[in-house]
Design a protein with these regions (language model features):
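Catalytic cores of carbohydrate-active enzymes across secretory and cytosolic contexts
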Residues: 1-530
């Protein structure tokens, strides 16, 4: 029987913390159906670059640097011979990275070169001479591991920018299986690829996949332009929505490569189930039956601390809004959940410091003189003090406003998926301010978690991939403060009937292009490859 093999940079092991939902849960369910294999980095860094040195992994296995550990998780009953039923188990194959691989492959080429390039921030590219070689070495490493256990009918699904070259090395090793690639982040226009001297080789490597998927039609168009520029395909044909390129990859026959957009979705039914009891549990709220939301309103924003997410632009525009509409002071609250990320990279550490300073400065700006705390007077960023006055994320109802008002409540804690969905339910506005984003599932989860009788409003950046599908949101340009201010005012004053109509239109789209259809559409095209 054909098995599905998923390769992603990080693997969520079943014996660690529960999977928070989204892609991890979806891939788990998909892999169970075919006794599939999930392969990738376990998140650990080996103690040294010497492959003779070993490290003990979380699951209790002893692993050498770049020696792969196999772990099988079964949820089935035992068969008559005492073996788990094969259709209900997943095999996890993971490895640690060596310190040099972490520095040059992960921090270096993947996140200091490809990430800024694909997000059209080439001014932020930082590259050491060893970075590209390490990137290729790690891609080759995973291809070699695939070679060890691949079976003739297996299908390989590779995820994201960390592995542009894996298919190339698989073909070099004689692997002829179907291999698909899905890019979760944007595909940059040609002019950005032309600024990287390694682009011709990377695109040549990318052409060894059978199916390449992007998040949006815009990204697909960029991908096709880049492919045609570097590969000079002998033909380009269209079959339905997909484009097929015939390219020379040095094999015995021309290679056919399919490129299409497969917008990732969310599990709407599961999210709605998580919040279904809230309408019965929540305390009475006087504005629930009015046509206009009450003055005391909650805005929620959830982001990794990344320069692509537009956090500083959000805070700046929010400050302008409160100045232009002072009646919202002491009423409107922005709850920012911001997860620190990649702090080993200097650009991220600077951004992290700037985000916290900006939160502090805005809260100081809108405090009365008699309310200024010692930490404010000292001009320091006291994160603990900021969080002390933040409302409980599960209490984003009117009760939260009984506490002293501050403009921004800031949280760096990792929240469970259930807690986050409940927070969305309680919020009046969900704010996505991305400067560039492949999709942004927060936007989709926010809509899925809303109370249809009194839905909140989605404030959505035009530069998020989700905007291509979610035009019923209030679309803003995060690079234009006036656009954000106007969008906030529109969202805060929107009548109930309009909120309902917009929410229903957005929800219908989510149900049509959901997480399951994303998987099915991509894999259907991949399985059709001959």
């Amino acid at each position: 029987m054909s098995r599905l093999i998923v390769l992603s940079n990080r693997v969520k092991m079943p014996d660690n913390n529960p999977m928070a939902g989204g892609l991890a849960v979806a891939l788990s369910e998909l892999l169970k159906e075919s006794s599939g294999i999930w392969m990738g980095w376990n998140g650990q860094i080996a103690e040294s670059d010497n492959t003779a040195d070993s490290a003990v992994l979380d699951n209790g296995y002893k692993d050498n640097s770049n020696e792969f550990t196999t772990y099988t998780k079964s949820t089935s009953v035992l068969s008559s011979v005492g073996c788990p039923a094969s259709t209900l188990e997943i095999t996890y194959i993971t490895t640690a990275l060596t310190p040099k691989q972490y520095e040059h492959y992960y921090c270096g080429f993947a996140n200091n070169v490809l990430w800024p390039l694909l997000h059209e921030q080439t001014d932020l590219i930082r590259q050491a001479p060893e970075d590209y070689d390490s990137y290729q070495s790690v891609n080759r490493l995973f291809a070699q591991q695939l070679k060890q256990f691949i079976q003739p009918d297996d299908v390989i699904w590779v995820h994201d920018y960390h592995f542009l070259s894996v298919a190339y090395y698989c073909r070099q090793l004689g692997i002829t299986n179907r291999i698909g690639f899905f890019l979760h982040i944007p595909f940059a226009p040609l002019k950005f690829w032309q600024q990287l001297d390694r682009s011709p080789e990377l695109i040549k490597h990318l052409s060894h996949y059978d199916v390449i998927g992007t998040q949006t039609q815009h990204d697909k168009a960029n991908c096709l332009t880049v492919m045609q520029h570097y590969l000079k395909p002998s033909s380009v044909t269209q079959h339905g929505s997909a484009h097929c390129l015939t390219v020379d990859i040095g094999s015995s026959r021309p290679h056919r490569l399919t490129v299409d957009a497969y917008p990732i979705g969310v599990n709407v039914a599961k999210i709605q189930q998580l919040v279904s009891q809230l309408s019965l549990e929540c305390e009475p709220n006087t504005h629930k039956n009015t046509h206009i939301k009450a003055a005391a309103q909650n805005i929620i924003a959830v982001d990794r601390i990344d320069y692509s997410k537009g956090l500083l632009e959000r805070f700046s525009a929010y400050s302008v809004f409160l100045q232009q509409y002072p009646n919202y002071q002491n009423q409107l609250k922005l709850f920012q959940i911001a997860c620190p990320s990649r702090l080993d990279l200097s650009v991220y550490q600077r951004l992290y410091d700037n985000v916290r300073q900006s939160v502090h400065d805005i809260n100081q700006q809108f405090l009365g003189t008699d309310e200024i705390s010692e930490s404010v007077k000292l001009g320091s960023v006291d994160l603990e003090a900021i969080n002390e006055t933040a409302p409980s994320i599960e209490g984003l109802s009117t009760a939260a406003f009984k506490r002293r008002w501050q403009a921004i409540s800031y949280c760096e804690n990792v929240l469970s998926h259930e807690t986050l969905m409940k927070a969305f339910w309680h919020s009046d506005i969900g704010w996505v301010n991305s400067l560039k984003d492949g999709m942004n599932l927060v936007a989709k989860e926010y809509i899925a978690a809303q109370n249809p009788a009194n839905p909140g409003v989605l404030l959505l950046s035009r530069y998020a991939g989700a905007a291509e599908q979610m035009q019923a949101a209030v679309i803003i340009d995060p690079q234009q403060p006036d656009s954000i201010v106007q969008g906030l005012n529109t969202a805060l004053s929107m009548p109930l009937q309009e909120r309902k109509e917009r929410h229903q239109a957005l929800l219908n789209g989510l149900k049509q292009d959901n997480l399951q259809s994303w998987q099915q559409d991509f894999l259907e095209d991949l399985y059709q490859v001959v």
